[in-house]
């Protein structure tokens, strides 16, 4: 869709279309709608990012908590959003062997315990084999640094999802 179509959307349609570009956070799309008109993809994403950046720490952590565990319990039960399902499937996380899945699950549990939110990674920009290494590396980061890194991954995911919706190259 083109930016003129985006700018002509009523509130409900905008939230329906863009409500999950930040995982399970339609409130952000609801707030961004009022910033119309947008000049293009960069302008649209700027408003999503500014909303996240303007949140207090508890709100930023809440945004992160809306993300599913990578290769977690939601994956086999079909409880992922359509976007997360596609992203995790394309990354091959559904194809992990039993031992790999167990190790990844252990690391994600350690991560959640340490930081209080799930490990977030823009899978479409990553080598699937690198996800466990990246998780292990980020487990060693100081909490404030990891919060910034995880929010950066949320923004990458948002950019990719917005580009997909607007039919643009990421």
Curated annotation (Swiss-Prot):
Pathway: Purine metabolism; urate degradation; (S)-allantoin from urate: step 3/3. It is an enzyme of class 4 (lyase). Its main location: other. Keywords: Decarboxylase, Lyase, Peroxisome, Purine metabolism. The active site is at 67 (proton donor). It comes from the Eukaryota. GO terms for cellular component: peroxisome. It is found in: Peroxisome. Its EC number is 4.1.1.97. Pfam families: OHCU_decarbox (PF09349). GO terms for molecular function: 2-oxo-4-hydroxy-4-carboxy-5-ureidoimidazoline decarboxylase activity. The keyword Lyase applies. GO terms for biological process: allantoin metabolic process; purine nucleobase metabolic process; urate catabolic process. It catalyses: 5-hydroxy-2-oxo-4-ureido-2,5-dihydro-1H-imidazole-5-carboxylate + H(+) = (S)-allantoin + CO2. InterPro entries: OHCU_decarboxylase, OHCU_decarboxylase-1, OHCU_decarboxylase_sf. Substrate binds at residues 68, 84-88, 119-123. Catalyzes the stereoselective decarboxylation of 2-oxo-4-hydroxy-4-carboxy-5-ureidoimidazoline (OHCU) to (S)-allantoin. Belongs to the OHCU decarboxylase family. This is 2-oxo-4-hydroxy-4-carboxy-5-ureidoimidazoline decarboxylase.
